[in-house]
């Protein structure tokens, strides 16, 4: 398993393990300082950030990941109170073809302006209904539930903008490995 996968699992375990507000705030409330190698890792190849004046927090997710699904409500709550000097970025995982397909549908929804409604619905469909949302006909039907007709879905999902967004997410994933 790659170092990125171990780090991702450790971060997810930290969030899932912090199931109460009291537990989540222990390091800050106890005066403990965060330490490299204990609370975070310094990347060998530091990544660039969009705005150096902000703290960038990137959530790497996959609609098929039950841990990502379980984390969504906590992230939504956290985002409500996040400081103005924090930039939150949602980035789909892309390490295989199925994940790239799901990255494509995420960026399609984002381009169509339906990301807020789409993300919980996609998680629910995959996690609770067991439908993987990978076939074109299935996706056309799924997007119809957001008032997106088949032709609009096809045009946006195959657009340069969506393909480029998936490629950029994939480059970031490889940079973090």
Regions found by a protein language model. Name each.
Residues 4-97, 170:
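Extracytoplasmic thiol/disulfide redox context detector
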Residues 95-177:
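Cysteine-centric redox/oxidoreductase cores and disulfide-bonded domains
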């Amino acid at each position: 398993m790659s170092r990125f996968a171990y780090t991702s699992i450790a971060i997810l375990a930290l969030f899932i393990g912090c199931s109460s507000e009291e537990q989540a705030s222990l390091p800050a409330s106890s005066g403990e300082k965060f330490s490299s190698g204990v609370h975070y890792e310094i990347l060998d190849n530091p990544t660039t950030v969009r705005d150096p004046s902000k703290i960038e927090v990137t959530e790497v997710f996959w609609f098929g990941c039950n841990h990502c699904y379980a984390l969504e409500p906590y992230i939504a709550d956290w985002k409500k109170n996040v400081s103005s000097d924090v930039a939150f970025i949602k980035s789909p995982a892309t390490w295989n073809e199925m994940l790239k397909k799901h990255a494509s549908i995420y960026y399609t929804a984002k381009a169509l302006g339906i990301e807020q409604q789409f993300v919980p619905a996609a998680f629910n469909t995959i996690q609770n209904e067991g439908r993987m949302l990978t076939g074109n006909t299935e996706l056309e039907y799924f997007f119809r539930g957001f008032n997106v007709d088949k032709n609009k879905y096809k045009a946006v999902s195959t657009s340069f903008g969506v393909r480029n967004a998936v490629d950029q997410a994939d480059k970031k994933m490889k940079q973090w490995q």
